[in-house]
Amino acid sequence: SAASDVYKRQDYGGANVAKPLHVGHLRSAVIGESIKRIGKFMGHHMIGDVHLGDWGLQMGLVITGLQERQPDLVYFDENYTGEYPEEAPFTISELEEIYPCASGKSKEDEEYRNEALEATHQLQQGKPGYMALWNHIMQVSVTDLKRNYANLNVSFDLWKKESDAQPYIPDMVQKMKDQGFAYEDQGALVVCLLYTSPSPRDS
């Protein structure tokens, strides 16, 4: 039938790793799961995607917060060239404590926030120690998220992440610059989304 030939991809997770789920995630998960089931009942091929937030400032905050608590961990040794531990240096309970503490401190301490921003940048540039920590954060968080979603009877076909888009970003940024969509403003590369607002170049 025509309905069975239609593919629907539904993003209804939106959880952030290293952070606990809250009531907003409950709403989107239940509504999304309902839409997916209704679509399947109607004959559509539905694909559920959790779409994890794993590549933003919260990662830099966790890394900075962990370094403040355990500065002697091998992940922070600039001269270390060996294999990193397979077991995470934190539990999910500790991880969920690190983030809010680091986030709160970053709002009061500009230097601390800048350290977290730099840690985020270094992670996104592939710094080995930070990538190893990111893998630990992902493993611990996803295990806990799957347990929580299972308790809600919510399931996903795909566990895609923000970081999955990283390989495409450099070319996309260059294309936006080449085509005049992106411009620098106060040291940041900006894309104006309001088409009625002229670019600074036009003023």
At which residue positions do the language-model features occur?
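NTP-dependent nucleotidyl-transfer catalytic core
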Residues: 1-203
